[in-house]
Amino acid sequence: MGYNKSLRYSRHNGTTCVIDNKHLKSLGSVLGDVRHKEELIREAQFDPIKDIANQYMVTEDPFRGPGKNVKITLFKEIRRIQPDTMKLVCNWSGKEFLRETWTRFISEEFPITTDQEIMDLWFELQLRPMQPNRCYKFTMQYALAANPDYVAHDVIRQHDPYYVGPDNRERINLSKRGLAFPLTCLQSIYNENFEEFFDQVLWPYFHRPLVYVGTTSAEIEEVMIEVALLFKIKEFAPDVPLFTGPAY
């Protein structure tokens, strides 16, 4: 960094005085000048880095992007997880959809109408310990690009898992690159045949996740697992105003 004339002089407001022909100033003003000079030097060093960084673009979190989030809870279930193992959350098979837990907690109607476009799809997992005062963390592993004919194991060994995010909640993006989701009659398909809604509507255009969940505990733990699909939809402007009158 070169010589800067603006760093030569200190700026004092009522902090200096002259006693016995000696120029005095308060120690606080000296410390303030030091901090001010350090800030100027730091800004001068950061400016060239900022100019270079402005030439590049970075991606933001797509979950916080434009659009409206619509959540559909698939099921809630209490499962026992053995130590050093991970249990499959959902295998998306036909027999699993007929269980009582799916029909009890499932949404009665599909909240996305035909005039709304699906921009993105997320698999949301919420984990809760069933016993109080338990000190352990939730672990997780998942696969997206699995073969449709692959039969997933119900229980696997923990091998290099990662910890579930804050609030014991994790979201997985299921979008495939280069595939646009068509506008179809989603509401009628969802209400008529729930199983075909996944096999014929979602999985041809989105990844089918295989998610395993475990704990760091050395004992058998009971965990409440809540699975939901979170749709990011694009809302189109209506053709006519929703309200009429002098105030609108």
From Swiss-Prot:
**Keywords (A to Z) from UniProt:** Viral occlusion body
Taxonomically, the superkingdom here is: Viruses
Q: Name one GO molecular function term.
A: structural molecule activity
Q: Which GO terms describe its cellular component?
A: viral occlusion body
- InterPro entries, A to Z: Polyhedrin
- Give the Pfam families listed for this entry: Polyhedrin (PF00738)
Q: What does this protein do?
A: Component of the virus occlusion bodies, which are large proteinaceous structures, that protect the virus from the outside environment for extended periods until they are ingested by insect larvae.
Family according to the record = Belongs to the polyhedrin family.
Provide the protein name: Granulin
What is the protein's species of origin?
A: Xestia c-nigrum granulosis virus
Lineage, top ranks: Viruses, Viruses incertae sedis, Naldaviricetes, Lefavirales, Baculoviridae
